[in-house]
Amino acid sequence: METVDSTRAFVKNVKRLIVKVGTAVVTRADGRLALGRLGALCEQLQELNSQGYEVILVTSGAVGVGRQRLRYRKLLNSSFLDLQKPQTELDGKACAAVGQNGLMALYDSLFSQLDVTSAQLLVTDNDFRDPDFRRQLNDTVNSLLSLKVIPIFNENDAISTRRAPYEDSSGIFWDNDSLAALLALELKADLLVLLSDVDGLYSGPPRDPDSKLIYTYIKEIHERVITFGDKSRVGRGGMTAKVKAAMYAAYAGIPVVITSGFATDNIIKVLHGERIGTLFHCDANKWASIGETDAREMAVAARACSRRLQALSSQERSKILQDIADALEANEKAILAENEADVVAAQQAGYEKSLISRLALNPGKISSLANSVRVLSNMDEPLGHTLKRTEIADGFILEKSSSPLGVVLIIFESRPDALVQIASLAVRSGNGLMLKGGKEAKRSNAILHKVITSAIPVSVGERLIGLVTSREEIPELLKLDDVIDLVIPRGSNKLVSQIKASTKIPVLGHADGICHVYVDKSADMDMAKRITVDAKIDYPAACNAMETLLVHKDLAQNGGLNDLIVELQTKGVSLYGGPKASSLLMIPEARTFRHEYSSLACTVEVVEDVYAAIDHIHQHGSAHTDSIITEDQEVAEVFLRQVDSAAVFHNASTRFSDGFRFGLGAEVGISTGRIHARGPVGVEGLLTTKWLARGSGQIVDGDKSIVYSHKDLTQQG
């Protein structure tokens, strides 16, 4: 999910960048060159080079490559007796001399395949003591870059006079990380990217599940909490060296990002402003507030609060919902004022009318929302409901009971009223909740969240419902499959598809709302006109609005189709036809049947009969809601049984496919999936089950001492 992080906005001004790739990225575990990773690296640099970026590469790996080659050569020249003797470590300078040739030959070959010219520059720390060298270095690099050549730097370890330890008071640079930082200053780079074998800087060893990736390094916050693990299998300094080099460059005014070199497109993502890796920036200390509450901490807090909520009685949970309803009505003016500000901003930004329609809270909406919350508070208790009760054996009773899911993440667009519905359902079902609304409803969501959480008692905690305000946090949230139990995306096809592709957490929702109304030849035409008009114009932007009108072929001959068309056009509906309807009605042909207009427009097509209508729905629909209008009960039953959608209606508008209208009190969304919940999802869709066994000392012991009865006691319970 591509997005520009607010702290990465500086990338739009990047012209010259230095990319440093470490030995752990350049080589495989066996010491051989990692051809796949190097190929991906060169492809990224070629793409940037072609886009006008000035790209400089600093590479490690020569010593590692040389060591592997010399070990192989030594093995070939050793007798069996030689191999039994203790093996001495190969001289690093000799390894560097041998490996440099092979490493650069590979870079030259890869870049040549991409029509890019590269140049090798070997340097030592002593070189930088000479001002003339530094001036000449700048001249040479500037000349190469003007010719779109990619300079490749490496420390000339073969002739370096520096000895271990690599860092000392007299050194100018100590490894290729510090060389890259030094070059960034000398060559006036706009960005330094350090590629590692991990995703960035973690609060602890990356393999520790409690370690968290730090997206923006703030020295005052992170210096005292970070624990470094072992360095990589190769290379000199590991993450410690990278952090020191990054801080050196960042405090000199050059942003640095440490990220993984194992991914095939991380450099491109960095330059797109995506929130990957760890950013070091001279202004990072001003961004302490951007640290927000960590996504994991928010989810963990929501779970802790949900367990306290579950411990309350049914009456106490109902009282919370009643307090929320009262708070909504008491703050109606403030809510509507913030919503109006969102609507005005959306209009000025040029948003589509359908989005603005979903965004606006009309007069009376707050009262309606409050009433729906009260209805929910008066519904039967959903938790701890015994679904099945079985006597396993004498004195051994097993119950299947309803239980909360845990923590639910809802990502929704445009509609602030959805926040109220979702939050009230979470309270009723005993779940913790994480909410991420669209930026277009930022003010509305903030005030609604504040009003609702203020009504939650301290004994439960207002962190029961967390509001995520930054879009950049979504990728991090979607990684939390150990603390978030379900994701429900409510929005566009693109949003839902991206969410499903980006997480291991179960996802419940629908990608499209392509709803059909089929008017059969035996339909009551007055009823048909009322239903089709309502299904389209009652709320055109809703996911349960009609998007395709299917009409039996006989109605095209007896005037019924024309009556429907006139009725829709009179209401301002734009019509687009399928191949048959467009020629019959002289209307524009629809580009595709799989199109969700979300506005006063729909597709019309003529079909042979109910079976053709069913086939059309299965081929082009989204399994959301479909309706038939007919007086023929047999045809109606065929449609109801055979249409494989979450909701199938007879002689009713598709707009009834709604949690409130179904009597669910409210809904968190509509699911077109076939697992867990389907159709409008109310309280029951946020529940799972647990097994409760009450015994009297029973043991298995090979089933020798127990007599199973398996008696159903559900009705007796």
Curated annotation (Swiss-Prot):
Coiled coil: none annotated. Pathway: Amino-acid biosynthesis; L-proline biosynthesis; L-glutamate 5-semialdehyde from L-glutamate: step 1/2; Amino-acid biosynthesis; L-proline biosynthesis; L-glutamate 5-semialdehyde from L-glutamate: step 2/2. GO terms for cellular component: cytoplasm. The keyword Oxidoreductase applies. One of its GO terms (biological process) is L-proline biosynthetic process. Its EC number is 2.7.2.11, 1.2.1.41. In the N-terminal section; belongs to the glutamate 5-kinase family. In the C-terminal section; belongs to the gamma-glutamyl phosphate reductase family. This is Delta-1-pyrroline-5-carboxylate synthase. It comes from Solanum lycopersicum. The lineage of its organism: Eukaryota, Viridiplantae, Streptophyta, Embryophyta, Tracheophyta. The gene is PRO2.
